[in-house]
Regions:
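Feature for soluble, non-membrane regions of globular proteins
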Residues: 1-193
Length: 193
């Protein structure tokens, strides 16, 4: 059975307030976990394995399974993509700078891409064929479904920011950069580069 990852609300303040996090974490994220558990029961594999092996599930359940598995994984990736520790250089950041020319250029491209997202979904920094890419995926689509490895996730569903930012999604996107967890992203990068 899948369970929620731990989340310390203090690590995301003041960028996202407690009321917003409580709704997001305890209602939206929890609903995806509950739905996935009811669909796959005691399936003894990771959410990533469910996504990668969706063809092994009952054809009539696949659509619901992939939406809820994506919902669980994307939320976990999003929550793990943030903390309030100061930004530090690491191999991931060094390689981002090599590919994008500067950290500021990467940041600007990521923000520009996120601001172009229409409707609900996520902006991801992914690793694809050994290179970085910044992609927008709708709803609960997941990079693993497209043979990409997610490194950073920004949730652009309104429930992720609305209670804190109301309709100022651009400010939410900009503020996200003050709490990106590059240490977590680097750990994934080092395992998959």
């Amino acid at each position: 059975m899948f369970k929620k990852i731990k989340l310390d609300y203090k690590t995301l303040a003041p960028v996202i307030d407690d009321k917003n996090l409580d709704l997001h974490y305890n209602k939206h994220y929890q609903k995806y976990i509950d739905n996935l558990n009811s669909l796959v029961g005691d399936y003894n594999q990771s959410v990533v394995n469910i996504i990668k092996n969706i063809e092994s599930f009952d054809k009539n359940k696949r659509s619901s399974i992939i939406v809820n598995a994506g919902g669980v994984y994307n939320h976990e990736m999003y929550f793990r993509s943030m903390n309030n520790k100061p930004y530090t250089n690491n191999k991931l950041v060094d390689d981002i700078v090599k590919q994008y020319g500067s950290y500021d250029n990467f940041k600007n491209i990521f923000i520009e891409n996120a601001n172009k997202m229409v409707g609900s979904g996520y902006t991801f920094l992914v690793l694809k064929d050994g290179k970085f890419d910044i992609v927008n995926l709708p709803n609960q689509d997941n990079p693993y479904s497209y043979n990409m490895i997610p490194l950073i996730a920004l949730d652009l569903w309104e429930h992720a920011y609305y209670l804190t930012y109301y309709n100022d999604r651009a400010q939410y996107i900009n503020n996200f950069f003050s709490i990106i967890n590059f240490d977590y992203a680097n750990m994934i990068y080092e395992k998959n580069k």
